[in-house]
Each structure stands twice: as C-alpha cells, then as structure tokens.
C-alpha cells in the first residue's frame, strides 16, 4: 500500500478496530515519510460465481442486485436504506452457503423472499420480470399466493 499523499511505501498502523460495517477492520495508518495519517478499511473478498440461464458463469455483482431491488421498489414504501439492507442480507445468505456457485434462480428466490416480507407491490413487480410469465394465469397464481389465505 502506498501513502495517498506522497506515494511512499512505508507505513505504520497506529490503530486497528472492528468497523461498524459488516466484516471490516478499520485501520489508522501513518506515512513514515510525510507523517500524514489516513484510514483504511479491510474486508474479506469472497468471490461468488453466478450460473446464468444460458450456462455462462459470471462474478456476483452486488450493484446488479441493488439495481433490480431499486427497480422493483420504486414508488413503494421501500427506501434506499431498506434496499441496501435487503441486498446486504441476500449477500450474507449467499456467502453462508457452502457452494460458491449460485444460480440466478437461487438469487431470484432469495430476492422474492425478502421483497415479499418488505412490500407486496415490489414483490409482484420483481416476480413479473424474474419469472417471465407466459400468460395471465401464471401471474394470477403469484397474486393469489401473495394475499393472505389466497383471498380475492
């Protein structure tokens, strides 16, 4: 690591502690040349491979997950903080799995699980895109399953 002020490579760690953010360590560092201090955050990087519908593999991209959640939850009572929390919960669920290869189907089901708890409109919007309904009957099944006791 280089000093962001003078690009010198010799630094010393002054303080280390757990960060309020999940799975991160916050470190205060000091450059041995210019004596400037700065903060770094260290996180564990665990790569999750996503198996796409066409058989390709792609690295998991949290930004794609967040964009999908934002699209489904726009104009609902779900705010930006809740979108971030849902994305974080889904990522933690994925990291908790033994297998580092996850299908888009598994990710979609997790998204639907969390959206169903958070907001039914967002859940239905996501289901319409994710499940690729072929006819109105399939949509009706989701709508009926989303209502308490299948009431009409």
UniProtKB/Swiss-Prot annotation:
Residues in ATP-cone domain copies: 48-138
InterPro entries according to UniProt: ATP-cone_dom (IPR005144), NrdR-like_N (IPR055173), RNR_NrdR-like (IPR003796)
Keywords: ATP-binding, DNA-binding, Metal-binding, Nucleotide-binding, Repressor, Transcription, Transcription regulation, Zinc, Zinc-finger
Cofactor names: Zn(2+)
The record's free-text note on cofactor binding: Binds 1 zinc ion.
BP terms from Gene Ontology: negative regulation of DNA-templated transcription
ZnF bounds (unnamed): 3-34
KW Flavoprotein (keyword) present: no
MF terms (GO), sorted A to Z: ATP binding; DNA binding; zinc ion binding
Record carries keyword Transcription: yes
Biological function: Negatively regulates transcription of bacterial ribonucleotide reductase nrd genes and operons by binding to NrdR-boxes.
Family stated for the protein in its record: Belongs to the NrdR family.
Name listed for the protein in its UniProt record: Transcriptional repressor NrdR
Gene assigned in the entry: nrdR
């Amino acid at each position: 690591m280089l000093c962001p002020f003078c690009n010198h490579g010799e630094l010393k760690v002054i303080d280390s502690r757990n960060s309020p953010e999940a799975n991160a360590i916050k470190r205060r560092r000091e450059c041995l040349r210019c004596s400037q201090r700065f903060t770094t955050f260290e996180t564990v990087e665990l790569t999750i491979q996503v198996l796409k519908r066409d058989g390709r593999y792609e690295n998991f991209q949290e930004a794609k997950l967040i964009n999908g959640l934002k699209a489904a939850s726009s104009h609902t009572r779900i705010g930006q903080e809740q979108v971030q929390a849902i994305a974080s919960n889904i990522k933690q669920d994925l990291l908790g799995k033994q297998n580092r290869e996850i299908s888009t189907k598994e990710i979609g089901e997790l998204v639907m699980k969390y959206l169903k708890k958070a907001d039914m409109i967002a859940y239905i919007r996501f289901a319409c895109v994710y499940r690729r309904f072929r006819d109105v009957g399939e949509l009706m099944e989701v709508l009926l399953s989303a209502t308490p006791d299948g009431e009409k």
